[in-house]
């Protein structure tokens, strides 16, 4: 059985919990997820099974879309509401809608982000959250991220009693972006403490939340022999790649890992198909000669079965 399960991860579960439960439901070991979601975050979590586990890296590197909420007026150790409050500053008046929109827009494009201490990023073989819990000092790595969308959703809400303001947003971003940290950085630009107070992943790996299934729905489909109705073929991952249909001679060469020439092509990566399915990714080896070399092989890919 091969394919991608468009799973909706519920809150209170880790991504690895989901993998474990899918293994039990499907009675198979070859299962992997394509991008960690924190326990307090729900939304799209593509689960790869069988041959599709070979495309986990491609899914991980895809862009993501989130919707969530930022609260101005307090900050925590974890940059969300799970941590201990480390700073509070009451707002005497609300930040204007125009100022919020302007500040959100300032994040668009490429920038450098430092991941939060309570994160799974590894430094010298240890997760940052291990350093944080042990109280050990560590220099966090800088990451280049790209924000493609950061828009206000609805109207901001101001609570005069608590001196806090909340607003919802939608954000499109590159792999490895921490929305928690975006929330903190947003507040910093306004001279205010801030936290991410809610988050849902709407899209990952080209999979929208509306097409996802819960673990309970997956189990029901498995019991009823209807998994094929849920599984997304491995080929879905490469929808945006330029595709080349191979003839029999080229296919024979692919099987032997031979370099191939595609005179009309200039793309960095080509998705090569045979009998209607992606069989390999080839990467440019010599641009002037239009020569391509093997990059990723999916020779056993037959779609979902």
Curated annotation (Swiss-Prot):
InterPro entries: PsdUridine_synth_cat_dom_sf, PsdUridine_synth_N, tRNA_psdUridine_synth_TruB, TruB_C. It is an enzyme of class 5 (isomerase). One of its GO terms (biological process) is tRNA pseudouridine synthesis. The keyword tRNA processing applies. Keywords: Isomerase, tRNA processing. Pfam families: TruB_C_2, TruB_N. Its EC number is 5.4.99.25. GO terms for molecular function: RNA binding; tRNA pseudouridine(55) synthase activity. It comes from the Bacteria. It catalyses: uridine(55) in tRNA = pseudouridine(55) in tRNA. The active site is at residue 38. Gene3D superfamilies: Pseudouridine synthase. Belongs to the pseudouridine synthase TruB family. Type 1 subfamily. Responsible for synthesis of pseudouridine from uracil-55 in the psi GC loop of transfer RNAs. This is tRNA pseudouridine synthase B. It comes from Latilactobacillus sakei subsp. sakei (strain 23K) (Lactobacillus sakei subsp. sakei). The lineage of its organism: Bacteria, Bacillati, Bacillota, Bacilli, Lactobacillales. The gene is truB.
């Amino acid at each position: 059985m091969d394919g991608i399960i468009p799973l909706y991860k519920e809150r209170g579960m880790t991504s690895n919990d989901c993998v474990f439960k899918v293994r039990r439901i499907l009675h198979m070991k070859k299962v992997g997820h394509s991008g960690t979601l924190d326990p307090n975050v729900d939304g799209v979590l593509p689960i790869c099974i069988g041959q599709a586990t070979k495309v986990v890296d491609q899914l991980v590197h895809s862009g993501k879309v989130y919707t969530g909420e930022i609260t101005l007026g307090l900050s925590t150790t974890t940059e969300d509401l799970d941590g201990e409050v480390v700073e509070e500053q009451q707002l005497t008046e609300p930040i204007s809608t125009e100022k919020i929109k302007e500040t959100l827009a300032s994040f668009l494009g490429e920038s450098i982000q430092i991941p939060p201490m309570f994160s799974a990023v590894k430094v010298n073989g240890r997760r940052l959250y291990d350093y944080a819990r042990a109280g050990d000092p560590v220099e966090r790595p800088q990451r280049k991220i790209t924000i493609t969308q950061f828009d206000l959703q609805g109207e901001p809400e101001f609570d005069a009693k608590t001196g806090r303001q909340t607003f919802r947003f939608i954000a499109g971003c590159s792999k490895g972006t921490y929305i928690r940290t975006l929330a903190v950085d947003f507040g910093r630009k306004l001279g205010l403490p801030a936290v991410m107070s809610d988050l849902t992943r709407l899209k990952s790996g080209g999979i929208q939340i509306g097409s996802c299934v819960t673990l309970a729905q997956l189990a029901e489909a498995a019991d009823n022999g209807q998994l094929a109705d849920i599984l997304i073929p491995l080929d879905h991952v490469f929808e945006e790649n330029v595709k080349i249909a191979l003839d029999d001679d080229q296919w024979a060469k692919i099987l032997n890992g031979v370099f191939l020439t595609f005179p009309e092509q200039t793309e960095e990566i080509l998705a090569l198909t045979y009998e209607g399915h992606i069989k390999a990714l080839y990467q440019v080896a010599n641009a002037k000669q239009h020569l391509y070399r093997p990059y990723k092989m999916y020779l056993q890919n037959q779609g979902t079965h």
